[in-house]
Regions:
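Conserved beta-propeller blade signature
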Residues: 65-68, 127-130, 190-193, 252-255, ...
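Sequence/structural signature of beta-propeller modules
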Residues: 1-36, 394
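Beta-rich catalytic cores
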Residues: 53, 89, 114-117, 134, ...
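Blade-level signature of beta-propeller repeat domains, shared across WD40, Kelch, NHL, RCC1
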Residues: 324, 367-394
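Signature of short aromatic-glycine-proline-rich micro-motifs recurring in repeat-based ectodomains
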Residues: 42-59, 107-124, 169-187, 232-249, ...
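Short loop/turn segments immediately following beta-strands, especially the blade-tip
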Residues: 79-87, 142-150, 204-213, 266-278, ...
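Short loop/turn segments immediately following the C-termini of beta-strands
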Residues: 71-72, 81, 133-134, 143, ...
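Surface-exposed loop and turn segments in beta-propeller and other repeat-based domains
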Residues: 19-47, 88-111, 151-174, 213-236, ...
Length: 394
């Protein structure tokens, strides 16, 4: 549905601007998190119904289960089935001894069932993968957890479950080391990890089967031992500054390069080290890196710290985090293409949290961090509002 807008124009803003709604105009189908839809957001004590800055969520199938990275509470929350009402309490917890405690690694040392700033999460084979960012590792469950504090089966980035040093304590990085791995994705047997602090994406050609297994190839760096932002040079078609979310759009790899304020899109799935992408969205060329293309206000072709990316129906959707909105593109994409779709703001030139810096409602967003999809449901980690939204597509 195309909606003509009549707005008070900001500088260089068209008086009439149109866009397509990416998600249902009725707002979120389900809101998870304790506050009501009109309440002010405050940090929340841990419980089965509260979250603090969630950054990722995965609905495994339309009927569930649902797993959420409750990032600020250093835990995963699990629902056995797709939640059916707002504020529905979680059934399972991983990372803390109970629903009412918090702390990195449960205020202890790293274990196979503890977490420190969990961020990325995805279904992985028959199980689950989680970017356990501040433990500098990725945890893999070979089967979906079905109980509290189920331990992971495999760890990547560390030699075992009991260490958590950056790059295993070394100055340089390597194929088996990590620094703040924020994003994870599994596609056609391959595991992709946004090794954010090392400014790269690591790829395993098959699902790893042993602890500390090295990646097969790297994107964003010339080789496995480099870790400089943008490969030590200016932004390019191959370099990254702060890679985060990952998705597949029409069989093409997409990486949300938040630090360069862009989405990188490859021609197909790259299979070799440092393969350059085909084009970017959010910048007019490969060399651009400024947020909102150097402007204070966003536009329909600019981004500001896009941390998340997902695909649903016909849409490629970016969680344009610092602009507190979702923006979407459809077919025939090219360098710097203008977005057609918008959710979370009234027009493309607005970036206010919850539309007007006020309280949240079913249609508003505040620093949406992670985004994923399952059939016709888009799952948004609305981090600034301490909640997760299950939102139906158009």
């Amino acid at each position: 549905m195309e909606i003509p807008l009549k707005i008070n124009p900001l500088p260089n803003t068209p008086i009439d601007e149109s866009f397509l709604n990416i998600l249902s105009l009725e707002g979120s189908d389900i809101i998870l998190g304790e506050q009501t839809s009109e309440s002010l957001v405050i940090p929340l004590e841990p419980s089965p119904t509260t979250m603090f800055g969630p950054r990722g969520a995965c609905l495994v199938s339309e009927t569930g289960p649902l797993w959420v990275c409750d990032t600020g509470h250093h835990r995963l929350l699990g629902w056995k089935h797709r939640p059916e009402r707002d504020g529905q309490p979680a059934d399972w917890i991983i990372g803390q001894p109970n629903f009412y405690q918090e702390g990195q690694n449960a205020k202890g040392t790293p274990q196979a069932n503890t977490l420190s700033v969990p961020t990325g999460i995805c279904a992985c084979g028959e199980g689950l993968a989680v970017g356990d960012a501040w433990n500098h590792r990725v945890l893999i469950w070979q089967k979906l957890p079905q109980d509290n504090n189920t331990p992971a089966d495999i760890v990547l980035g560390q030699a075992d479950f009991h260490h958590n040093q950056v790059n295993r304590g070394e100055t340089d990085t390597a194929a088996e080391r990590m620094h703040w791995p924020y994003g994870v994705m599994y596609y056609q047997g391959k595991l992709f990890v946004a090794d954010t602090g090392n400014r790269r994406v690591l790829v395993w050609n098959q699902l790893p089967t042993c602890n500390g297994q090295p990646a097969d190839y790297v994107l964003g760096q010339p080789d496995m031992n480099r870790r400089d932002e943008n490969g030590g040079d200016s932004p390019s078609a191959a370099s990254m500054r702060w890679p985060h979310g990952l998705a597949i759009w029409q069989n093409n790899l997409v990486v949300a390069d938040a630090g360069n304020n862009r989405l990188m899109i490859w021609d197909g799935i790259p299979t070799k080290n440092n393969t350059p992408c085909q084009f970017v969205l959010g910048q007019e060329n490969f060399e651009g890196a400024e947020l909102n293309r150097g402007g204070y206000f966003p536009t329909s072709n600019a981004l500001s710290m896009p941390y998340g990316v997902a695909v649903t129906n016909q849409w490629l959707i970016a969680a344009d985090t610092a602009n507190s909105r979702l923006v979407g593109w459809k077919n025939n994409l090219s360098m710097g293409a203008t977005a057609e779709g918008l959710t979370g703001q009234s027009h493309f030139r607005s970036k206010s949290e919850n539309r007007s810096y006020g309280s949240c409602d079913r249609n508003s967003l505040s620093w949406p961090y992670g985004i994923s999809s399952c059939d016709n449901t888009v799952i948004v980690a609305d981090s600034g509002n301490n909640r997760v939204l299950l939102w139906l597509g158009k």
